[in-house]
């Protein structure tokens, strides 16, 4: 019986970029690896260990090249990595040393952020060779095999291409994506940052969720409302939700989303749901005959039904001292509009 190949467990690198690893090039703890770049050039990467107190200052992430939305790297979203990186780092990050001497992290921004939070060192495969922006972007796409980029992170990258003048059709062709996915990604990227930042684990957000946030942003924008008031109003409740450690991440997301939509509805509909206040001006024996005043907010109107022209043509309202001198009559019911007031 032939043995079946066991499936690979863990992180695998794209074989097209890995030209080989020579074990003889590893002396002691020093590891050397050669990657093939998109231009056909080869670059040698040597492992370095960045001390805990230098990780933040000696490394950086260019989101344009890395592709990971750095604002989404919250302590809660990094929980799984933080719990392991304190003891060991299974895979090194990959970076290039720039002219400033700092290391740009092409792959491993989540490991970098976790190392900073936990105050531990960071292992990085670093090359001192000059790598172009295009080579860096392609290499980052090839080696990133950890957590798949969210539709918003993809959209943020595509948004830069669109802002550079590319059409959505050209973007789709260049990235090997359908035009529908490009549209969805761009819409997710347009969701208000202020609202997205309220979610501790943004990778839980779906396209439908981003559409909801976009709708909230549009509605508040139409009413010239700022997000600050909304955020201030719901922050205590969000803190209460986040204080429940055992709550599942998707449940946390759903609760926060409901808070946002509910508060946005209250803010945008404020004043539009004022109930009409109706005051009876005269009591008639005929139940279908009436004379009344209706007030809704700052607007008011007078309504009459089954009254003669003589009565409605010139009606004096003693309650406010206003003489109504003009009326428009429709069928047997009448609503005074427009008004001519004399005080």
Swiss-Prot record:
Q: Where is the composition biased (Polar residues)?
A: 11-26
The record's Gene3D superfamilies line, in alphabetical order, gives: 1.10.10.2830
Region span, Disordered: 1-26, 56-76
GO process annotations (BP): plasmid partitioning
Q: Which GO terms describe its molecular function?
A: DNA binding
InterPro entries recorded: ParB/RepB/Spo0J, ParB/Sulfiredoxin_dom, ParB_fam_C
Keyword match DNA-binding: yes
Protein keywords? DNA-binding, Plasmid, Plasmid partition
- Where does this protein bind DNA? 169-188
A Pfam family cross-referenced in the UniProt record is ParB
User: According to its UniProt record, which protein family does this protein belong to?
Assistant: Belongs to the ParB family.
**What PANTHER family does the record point to?**
PLASMID PARTITION PROTEIN B (PTHR38973:SF1), PLASMID PARTITIONING CONTROL PROTEIN-RELATED (PTHR38973)
Functional summary from the UniProt entry: Control of plasmid partitioning; required to recognize the cis-acting partition sites.
The molecule here is called Plasmid Partition par B protein
Q: Identify the gene encoding this protein.
A: parB
């Amino acid at each position: 019986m032939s043995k079946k190949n066991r499936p690979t467990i863990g992180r695998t690198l794209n074989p097209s970029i890995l030209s080989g690893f020579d074990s003889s090039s590893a002396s002691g703890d020093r590891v050397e690896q050669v990657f093939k770049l998109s231009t056909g050039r080869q670059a040698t990467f040597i492992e370095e260990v960045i001390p805990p107190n230098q990780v933040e200052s000696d490394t950086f992430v260019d989101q344009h090249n890395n592709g990971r939305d750095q604002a989404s790297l919250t302590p809660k979203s990094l929980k799984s990595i933080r719990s392991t990186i304190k003891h060991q780092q299974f895979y090194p990050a990959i970076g290039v040393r720039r002219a400033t001497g700092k290391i740009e992290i092409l792959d491993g921004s989540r490991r970098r952020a976790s190392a900073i939070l936990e105050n531990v060192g960071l292992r990085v495969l670093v090359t001192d060779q000059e790598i172009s922006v295009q080579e860096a972007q392609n290499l980052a796409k090839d080696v990133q095999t950890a957590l798949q980029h969210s539709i918003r992170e993809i959209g943020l990258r595509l948004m830069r291409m669109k802002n550079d003048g590319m059409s959505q059709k050209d973007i789709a062709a260049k990235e090997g994506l359908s035009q529908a996915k490009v549209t969805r990604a761009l819409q997710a990227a347009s969701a208000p940052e202020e609202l997205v930042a309220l979610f501790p684990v943004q990778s839980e957000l779906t396209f439908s969720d981003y559409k909801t946030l976009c709708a909230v942003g549009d509605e508040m924008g139409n009413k010239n409302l700022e997000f600050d008031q909304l955020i201030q109003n719901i922050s205590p409740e969000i803190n209460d939700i986040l204080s429940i450690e055992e709550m599942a991440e998707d449940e946390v997301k759903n609760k926060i989303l409901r808070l946002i939509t509910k508060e946005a509805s209250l803010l945008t509909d404020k004043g539009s749901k004022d109930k009409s206040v109706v005051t009876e001006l005269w009591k008639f024996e005929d139940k279908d005959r009436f004379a009344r005043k209706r007030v809704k907010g700052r607007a008011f109107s007078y309504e009459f039904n089954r009254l003669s022209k003589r009565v409605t043509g010139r009606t004096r309202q003693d309650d406010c001292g206003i003489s109504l001198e003009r009326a428009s009559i429709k069928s047997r019911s009448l609503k005074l509009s427009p008004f001519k007031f004399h005080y």
